[in-house]
Amino acid sequence: MSLYCRTFFRRKSFGCYRLLSTYVTKARYLFELKEDEEACRKAQKTGVFYLFHDLDPLLQASGHRYLVPRLSRAELEGLLGKFGQDSQRIEDSVLVGCSEQQEAWFALDLGLKSASSSRASLPKSEMEAELGGSFIKLRQALFQLNSVDSSLLFTAQALLRWHDGHQFCSKSGQPTQKNVAGSKRVCPSSKIIYYPQMAPVVITLVSDGARCLLARQSSFPKGLYSALAGFCDIGESVEETVHREVAEEVGLEVENIQYSASQHWPFPNSSLMIACHATVKPGHTEIQVNLKELEAAAWFSLDEVTTALRRKGSLALQPSEASPLLLPPKLAIAHHLIKKWVETRSCSSLAA
């Protein structure tokens, strides 16, 4: 009976989608592609593909912006044929989303090698010439992409990187096998199933009411300051991580921790950024910077932060000798934490 029900509802599923909201329809369609190998292979035939080479996405310059080209199945097969490869290479692709019309989106890296395949890496420069684009470091291109494209490429790169790093079973040492959608890997020997994961990271904007605390690492561009951030330790809650990280990095105790938002961040590896606001205990605002963690940390006034938010320009450009305060770009959740604090403080000032 259960087998009959599963078969019946699978046949009816596409018709039922029309009765649901667009979001629910997409979510259930993607779920089906992840669970049904046959359905996913069928979707590959009508889907589109985003190309990578050694985790660098294929991009095309358009003025000061980058466009993200995508290939149809026929175009991809034609490209592979020119480089002596057949359509089996498409099995290495991973599902990264779909359109409202249920056009499936896949990402395929033509530079990475698979432990379970003898397929070779394709020549980067020759492919760039053939495709009329360039394989560019995603972090380098970040500020020239729109938010929709950057989010999709974040997901694609993170998933491709995860598969590249989990080609062998940690228990048996044997090669693992990817399902068609790329939503998991399975070890045929140990039967262990591996799922893509993100490391939880708490990012916290600390305030004393009138000022906010920002810090920088030596690797940051000149003048750039951001909110405090750190990985969650095993066994910790989000609140415990906030308390510990602030204490470790700047020697302060915080209270009134409030969750704000979250964001997937692919650099250097996939992290789930959990954004919070917190305040220091009254009368305890003296910063003691942990130089093993940070290069500097300081309190900044509302006026200073407001001015920095209004400042235009790319972080790729070096600031002047005056080193004005630079803040994370709009794409980063730290920017939204800081902006939210400014908006809240500005409203409080007006009300007063």
From Swiss-Prot:
Residues 1-20 form a transit peptide. A motif (Nudix box) lies at residues 216-240. Transmembrane segments: none annotated. It is an enzyme of class 3 (hydrolase). It holds the Pfam family Zn_ribbon_NUD. GO terms for cellular component: mitochondrion. It catalyses: NADH + H2O = reduced beta-nicotinamide D-ribonucleotide + AMP + 2 H(+); NAD(+) + H2O = beta-nicotinamide D-ribonucleotide + AMP + 2 H(+); NADPH + H2O = reduced beta-nicotinamide D-ribonucleotide + adenosine 2',5'-bisphosphate + 2 H(+). NAD(P)H pyrophosphatase that hydrolyzes NADH into NMNH and AMP, and NADPH into NMNH and 2',5'-ADP. Has a marked preference for the reduced pyridine nucleotides. Does not show activity toward NAD-capped RNAs; the NAD-cap is an atypical cap present at the 5'-end of some RNAs. This is NAD(P)H pyrophosphatase NUDT13, mitochondrial. It comes from Mus musculus.
